[in-house]
């Protein structure tokens, strides 16, 4: 009788290792370039832009704080600090929920709408320059498919 193979790590094949290293090298480089452009062009951080763009895409430009934290996969503490900074700049405000004394909503202000409206075209151009225009349509489809598979596997509910 042949003994069962010893349990151990499932080492990466050469092609798997190539894919892993490509991801590890590519993502931070592309992200850093886009984040740098965002800050230079609009004065926004990635976190600012993420909050503004999510709120800007909701009905009434508002969302429960707890739902926003869950959607963004941030701790409530991290979101609270981010919202405090954004409130100080007048981009958002927090309001109590009339039907729930414990709940709070974050609301995009008119100033916040103006900021995201001005920043979005510049941000899209940066995304195009550093990612979209570098890839063929087929590569973009593959990237989108890979992203969706990983998001589903990790339980993500919405694009942020």
What annotation goes with each model-predicted range?
Residues 15, 47-49, 111:
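N-terminal positioning helix adjacent to the helix-turn-helix/winged-helix DNA-binding module
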Residues 2-8, 84-142:
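Charged, amphipathic alpha-helical coiled-coil/dimerization segments
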Residues 21, 53, 117, 144:
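A cross-family signal for key residues in well-ordered alpha-helices
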């Amino acid at each position: 009788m042949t003994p069962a193979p010893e349990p151990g790590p499932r080492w990466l094949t050469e092609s798997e290792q190539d894919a892993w290293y490509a991801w590890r090298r590519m993502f931070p480089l592309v992200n850093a370039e886009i984040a740098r452009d965002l800050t230079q062009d609009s004065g926004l951080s990635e976190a600012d832009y993420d909050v503004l763009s999510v709120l800007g895409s909701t009905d009434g430009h508002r969302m429960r704080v707890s739902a926003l934290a869950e959607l963004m996969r941030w701790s409530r503490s991290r979101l609270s600090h981010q919202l405090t900074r954004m409130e100080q700049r007048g981009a958002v405000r927090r309001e109590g929920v009339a039907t729930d004394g414990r709940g709070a909503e974050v609301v995009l202000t008119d100033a916040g709408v103006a900021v995201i409206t001005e920043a979005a075209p510049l941000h899209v151009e940066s995304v195009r320059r550093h990612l979209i225009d570098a890839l063929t349509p087929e590569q973009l489809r593959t990237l989108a498919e890979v992203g969706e598979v990983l998001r589903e596997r990790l339980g993500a509910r919405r694009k942020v």
